[in-house]
């Protein structure tokens, strides 16, 4: 209702919801008109200009409308995105007729350089248009990809009427959390350290055992095992996925621990409200007084994996999103990085206290105020050496991560004192900075005196930041990978593996393909192909050597000793499936060897004793000790042959079958060399040589332990190939006796490992692979975007990395072609754009700081993404033009016919040769990878820039209504003025109690005479000249119908009581309200949907 049509006696201007919706639809996000504006209210220097808000969010001005051209328009604020709005009563208004004119000032604040402006207009109609436009821009996000984070709504529990939530998972747990005073809690079954190292004297938190029950409504109940009574419950649906974390084993010396709870600093980063554990068991204890986090330890790794995925499915996800775009355009980030801490140097200062108390030094890696990884403790050393690596996989940007170097004093009375020596801030920019990919020494500054350097620390950081689309986008890619010829896929890798300059890149590439084909259940096929590739290379080498009449035995003696895609894949795969086996089979023996600290040295030059008689006696004792340890380890391996995971034995079986085909002479020795290279050299010996790297011990090994384990590994490697020690290491020739005695046992063991003969050994390790795992009763669509079990493989991440690799491989081919053409044409030749994949594209999935934080020099329109709906076929998204660019003429007209058939849904005919089918399938796989690559970069560019909107979004009434629900207001007092402050959401828990939604359920007109019966108000502002305390009255009303629409002539009563803002009516209550029509001409229908249809029909017929 415009001000001109208002009755004079009303003295109140209404801003109805329908006016807001109409303004959005007709004026969109732009505004034009004559407005008074200034930058400083106190100066009262108002200027009257023709102001305009453009479709890109710029607030500009010119002298008048006639001069509003590109040369005369000057910007006031360049970007209104995420602006903050305040409405101030204008006591000094030059507009005298308050009934006909607007006497309010709109204050607009942005984070830019010119960050504040005051606006006032003469008419209420213009005021509403301007306010609508500013509200719209306040909901748009500013530039920078990390500013586009959103958090999903809590998962709603769907069950049958009156049905109780079901129990999804039940576990026995050790819990570190708040100790409830009125409940006797049983002690934990496993003795673990406190995560904070120092014991808490008030005993408010501690370890206890409990039964954990995860229910289908997202509640995790902790129960007493004795009688099943409730200790307390956690509402998992109020947690973020980043607040459910698998703890690094270095924190508690346990690999099966999970952190659950609120991270206030993380929530502050995202601007979210608080969450608290709900203490249900004890009425005497206030839930707000207890800790808001717990740590749970599971008995088995598979239990942790199952529960982790189930909890993640209920938690709220963090994702990047463009306002108004389809959900298939949402992205999650994988912020993966590895921090290596090598050593520190504090030799320039004295670390001892005045009593020379014994101490240890260590480094914590913290983020959001919590410790997530910890180095081992080094005693009484000002130059501590660690060389430890820690892997992190975050879903968010890190804003406040630190390396905290701490000193722990061990007093005589067994009390511990902790001292923070210094800390170094690790930002996201440092993590992604390639300069830290090599060992870098950083200064450590004093905690109290930031200008005083107390030492240095040497670190190395490698990182990988990926932007991942929802799983729906990868459906076609997965189908192609399921049916692809893996030999042709491997050709892509081996063609480019020579360009992989270091082992890290080779390892990363191997893991990508390993994870993908393991998640697709094609892992054995993949190893078949990789082994064929490696053996083909060896066969070619042998043929060339034989042509020269030379001996080729040395080629087979070094079989799989070098690094390749195959060996790196096998290392990762064997340790993944065999980690539990290694732990249960060898960890106890290795700990015993290390803790004994008795030498096994046989080299006389290394024995420090000068007396020859005593030296011989020492060497003899060492020989017995070495023989005993090696015998104990071998017997353990031999006795547990049937416990070795079948996945490992299947790969060894494939390998042996391949070798027996190509090797005619000396087959047994070649097989022994090959099995040794895979099983002993790459599986058993790395764990024996460095048990700390594999988390079997927590402390660094001393020189004696390192040498002992090296000697044991040497003997086992020679045993694995039945090779005698010779003159190269004469002191070890004594151990040839051990090898001779185990000759037959070793052959028997190899036959069992390669399934050449049946293994009748009993299974004695009780591995978790023998335990049946419960099937998670969770919707598959929800599980598709979470890591897969077992092993928590992130399939979508690996598919994103696969896409990146395939495109990079194609770009390498293009570069080679360009060089060839350049040479062939005398430097004048150029590649035609259609001849290569992604030609002319400079896009890359590696992200630099400019992409993340700077505006993109393009006009980002959300509408460009409107057509990118959820689909299994990316060809439908990008259309035929891009597909034509991707086609190559080298296949000929036959290939073009195949392309047309594939894109039109025609299946291959049996007449087409299989080789041509496979070639076409590979071409289609590359094309799909290119499409996904461009899609990711297209969306990422939009996310990096300032948000804008297209015309399609303005037509979406549902979005406009949802926008109205997101706007809050708060009356605040600034000096003598009362200010109405508009907010996109509650900023924090300390916001004023007066903070309310702009559009909520209204109060009955009987209790408020200023509100008419037939009005659905968006905002009501009283313009009467009264006391300042009552000068800014707001009355905010709204209605809900079942389909989410809001209709003009309907007011729902608001239930009284604190904290009821945003509550929704139950269907029963809503139905009762609908039985009483709010207006006389509304039919008395019993159903809200029917009522909605009636309103819609009335609107279409013009209300007749």
Curated annotation (Swiss-Prot):
The keyword Phosphoprotein applies. SMART domains: C2 (SM00239), RasGAP (SM00323). Residues 1090-1104 have a biased composition (Basic residues). It comes from the Eukaryota. GO terms for biological process: axial cellular bud site selection; bipolar cellular bud site selection; establishment or maintenance of cell polarity; filamentous growth; invasive filamentous growth; invasive growth in response to glucose limitation; mitotic spindle orientation checkpoint signaling. InterPro entries: C2_dom, C2_domain_sf, Ras_GTPase, RasGAP_CS, RasGAP_dom, Rho_GTPase_activation_prot. The keyword Nucleotide-binding does not apply. Stimulates the GTPase activity of BUD1/RSR1. Participates in the regulation of bud-site selection. This is Inhibitory regulator protein BUD2/CLA2. It comes from Saccharomyces cerevisiae (strain ATCC 204508 / S288c) (Baker's yeast). The lineage of its organism: Eukaryota, Fungi, Dikarya, Ascomycota, Saccharomycotina.
